[in-house]
């Protein structure tokens, strides 16, 4: 079954359990960064939490180690080089840890919008990246995408309209509660 994708375009709240360590009452199994239990700022903690959040699950099999190793980990998820909503995008990095982020939007020209966090950097930020290699600079090397188990529908997709012949009344198939749902 398909689900309408809910984009994250702002930082998660400090109380969002997807970004709080399990030992502090949250759902996240990644390394704790802040004394309050937050796993942010860290790309691994963010991507792990966001992947679970978007699918409304409390745990997943994604790696919790170096982001540069995520793409080649045998975790049971499908992979590829074509972006999908909610997918984890993975990069390795020359001489250091890689980076992971989440695909929040795919534009008609092939560009993608990602949501991110960075270890010792920003708690939350967005990037627009260009195909085919979705470059983050010369030291990062695009590996591919780890796909979510959920088949997401883009919230910008036009909504089908059904017109009944007798009444000429248009019935709109509308998922308002999903489109207007705010993520904390």
Predicted regions and their residues:
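Secreted/periplasmic proteins that engage bacterial cell-wall peptidoglycan
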Residues: 1-120
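Aromatic- and glycine-rich peptidoglycan recognition patches
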Residues: 6-7, 106-171, 175, 184
């Amino acid at each position: 079954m398909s689900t309408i994708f809910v984009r994250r375009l702002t930082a998660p709240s400090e109380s969002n359990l997807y970004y709080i360590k399990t030992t502090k009452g949250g759902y996240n199994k990644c390394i704790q960064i802040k004394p309050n239990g937050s796993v942010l700022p860290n790309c691994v903690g963010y991507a792990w939490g966001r992947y679970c959040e978007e699918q409304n699950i409390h745990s997943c099999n994604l790696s919790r180690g170096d982001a540069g190793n995520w793409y080649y980990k045998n975790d049971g998820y499908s992979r590829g080089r074509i972006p999908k909503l909610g997918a984890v995008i993975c990069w390795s990095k020359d001489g250091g840890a890689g980076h992971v982020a989440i695909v929040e939007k795919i534009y008609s020209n092939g560009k993608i919008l990602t949501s991110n966090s960075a270890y010792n950097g920003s708690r939350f930020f967005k990037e627009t990246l260009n195909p085919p290699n979705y470059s983050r600079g010369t030291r990062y090397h695009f590996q591919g995408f780890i796909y979510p188990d959920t088949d997401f529908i883009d919230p910008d997709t036009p909504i089908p309209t059904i017109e009944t012949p007798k009444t000429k009344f248009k019935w709109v198939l509308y998922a308002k509660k999903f489109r207007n749902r705010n993520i904390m």
